[in-house]
Curated annotation (Swiss-Prot):
Its EC number is 2.7.7.41. GO terms for molecular function: phosphatidate cytidylyltransferase activity. Pathway: Phospholipid metabolism; CDP-diacylglycerol biosynthesis; CDP-diacylglycerol from sn-glycerol 3-phosphate: step 3/3. Highest activities is obtained at about 30 mM CTP and 2 mM phosphatidic acid (PA). The lineage of its organism: Eukaryota, Viridiplantae, Streptophyta, Embryophyta, Tracheophyta. It comes from Arabidopsis thaliana (Mouse-ear cress). Its cofactor is Mg(2+). One of its GO terms (cellular component) is chloroplast. This is Phosphatidate cytidylyltransferase 5, chloroplastic. The chain crosses the membrane at residues 123-143, 187-207, 217-237, 266-286, 309-329, 333-353.
Length: 399
């Protein structure tokens, strides 16, 4: 026989099943069962929706319903809490990743600035020293650049569409390129040397085992020209043009033990102006592109813009004019502007040429020799063609 609940004569009180397991303030979509207070006069009916109706109630059923609703409410609360925790963890991970990226960029920027200043001071001292010091430094840079170039040629991106030269021949060509600046200092010109080297390399390619490819010959000849022959013009400019620059203030105050006024030759002044112009061109182009860059310059280098290029041109010409006034060369303003324009175009053309090679190779940097700057070829690409233009300008303009 089912248990009964006796009803007293007092006013019944509403009771929700959800109130058995949760706070009474919580609203519930379920219907209410009104459980009256205890009395001895009546058997135990229940009031449903304020109507006096005898209902047989099993205490286990009430407990099961209350327990099920409690579990459902607890699961909903736990799921919401887990979702909030996951969201907070995701936000924390995103914030930490942003902090890591900012810290990495700051560290990269510090490396670039530190090594950039170190390289700049070292190059300045080498240029001022001239002679064998300058020539050996150029030869070392040429050797490293040639090795990086031939590694780019052998990379997957370029090698898929062509047959690269054999590795032993790439090493031989790198050594030949490094010897060219030294031969330039000793003989004054390397026309016969470069012709002989090109002939020997071409014969080695044609007589190799297997089927020789034109791509091997073309990439090797371009490597000799790009990495070996063109940098030799810096040696010819610094060490070959020995006429002193007159009326220069820094030359008159230069210590006699370091060569005196005769140390400041046309070649030294021209190379200092060219180097500073290239640095100004790269710096102003970078800053101008960051601030005003909208129109892409060329597809092989998507980050370069016309606005940045114009800023680089203005910066190169401005630095050239300032240095020409302090170093008293060139004398005329028109010649100074022309020299600045040549330095700018040589810098841009060299940069774009190396960008084309890296794009075909499918790499971002030519190497990882210099922390924060990439390889040596990434640092000297703007100087490769500029040396030939600067030397030609000085020879045509006259000392």
């Amino acid at each position: 026989m089912a248990p009964f609940v006796e009803v007293c004569r007092y006013k019944p009180l509403p009771l929700s099943l959800s109130s058995l397991c949760t706070c009474p303030c919580r609203s519930s979509p379920r219907k209410y069962l009104i459980l009256p207070q205890f009395s001895e006069k009546y058997p135990k009916p229940l009031l449903s929706h304020s109507r006096f109706t005898p209902i047989s109630v099993n205490r286990r059923v009430i407990t099961a319903v209350a327990r099920a609703e409690s579990n459902q409410i607890g699961d909903d609360a736990n799921s919401k809490e887990e979702h909030n925790i996951d969201q907070e963890l995701q936000n924390v991970e995103e914030d930490s990743s942003l902090d890591d990226q900012k810290q990495k960029s700051r560290s990269q920027f510090k490396k670039r600035v530190t090594f950039g200043l170190g390289i700049g001071l070292s190059v300045g001292g080498i240029v001022l020293a001239g002679g064998w010091v300058f020539t050996v430094a150029v030869a070392a840079a040429v050797l490293l650049s040639a090795r990086e170039y031939f590694e780019l040629v052998r990379s997957k991106g370029i090698a898929q569409g062509m047959t690269p030269p054999p590795r032993y021949l790439s090493r031989v060509c790198s050594i030949i390129c490094a010897l060219m600046p030294i031969l330039t200092l000793y003989f004054g010109h390397i026309d016969i040397s470069i012709t002989s080297a090109a002939f020997v390399v071409a014969m080695a390619l044609l007589l190799q085992r297997g089927n020789p490819r034109f791509s091997q010959l073309s990439s090797t000849m371009f490597g000799l020209f790009y990495c070996g022959y063109l940098p030799c013009f810096w040696v010819k400019l610094r060490c070959g043009l020995t006429a002193p620059v007159l009326n220069t203030g820094i030359g008159r105050s230069w210590p006699t033990i370091l060569g005196g006024q005769a140390h400041w030759t046309v070649g030294l002044v021209a190379i200092l102006i060219s180097f500073c112009g290239i640095i100004a061109s790269d710096t102003f182009a970078f800053l101008g592109g960051k601030a005003f860059g909208r129109t892409p310059l060329i597809s092989i280098s998507p980050k370069k813009t016309w606005e940045g290029a114009f800023a680089g041109l203005v910066g190169c010409i401005s630095i050239t004019i300032l240095l020409s006034k302090s170093l008293s060369w060139p004398q005329s303003l028109v010649s100074t502007i022309a020299f600045g324009v040549l330095n700018f175009f040589g810098s841009v053309f060299g940069d774009l040429t190396e960008s084309m090679i890296k794009r075909d190779a499918g790499v971002k940097d030519s190497g990882s020799l210099i922390p924060g700057h990439g390889g040596i070829l990434d640092r000297v690409d703007s100087y490769i063609f500029t040396g030939a233009l600067a030397y030609s300008f000085v020879r045509l303009h006259g000392v």
